[in-house]
Design a protein with these regions (language model features):
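Terminal-proximal interaction/regulatory segments of ATP-powered molecular machines
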Residues: 105-149
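Phosphate-binding/switch region of NTP-binding enzymes
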Residues: 1-100
């Protein structure tokens, strides 16, 4: 009935390592019904984001285990700060632009519009480099990288 009413249902669950598997894999608890009923299954994991010795946030990795709407087994990492900055809007966009051919990584620097700039400098002032037109191109790259067709 939820599908007919176009209402999404979000279910959270825990995962565990499969014992005795040849390749280490994660499995959801609660039986196999959820695996077959779900349209999308995303596994989340996190690691600490540090500034020196202080923990300032988390790096959250989302891996698509099953999806009827997008490509499976794709990873996306999101940075979440604990302070007022919250979710980092620009984290991971440098790598996405490199995959899509928007810019090149040459000897640890990104070549943008004929200039070579370090990633730290780009992330210090992201509004200067991630303009509206660049963000539209990155959106197109993300659509081809993560969705079907």
């Amino acid at each position: 009935k939820l599908g007919q009413a176009n209402i999404p249902m979000i279910v959270t669950n825990h995962t565990y390592d499969v014992i005795g598997a040849y390749v280490p894999t994660k499995e959801m608890g609660g039986g196999s019904g959820l695996k077959y009923a779900a349209s999308t299954i995303i596994y989340l994991s996190k690691k600490k984001e540090k500034d020196g010795t202080d923990v300032v946030g988390n790096l959250i990795k989302a891996k698509t285990a099953k999806s009827r709407l997008s490509k499976e087994n794709k990873d996306v990492t999101i940075r979440l700060y604990y302070d007022e900055r919250g979710l980092d809007r620009y984290y991971g966009l440098l790598e996405l632009g490199e995959i899509g051919g928007l810019w090149k990584n040459v000897a640890g620097r990104y070549e943008m519009d004929g200039k070579k700039v370090y990633a730290k400098q780009i992330l210090k002032e992201p509004e200067k480099y991630f303009t509206e037109s660049v963000m539209e191109k990155l959106d197109e790259i993300a659509a081809t990288e993560f969705s079907y067709g």
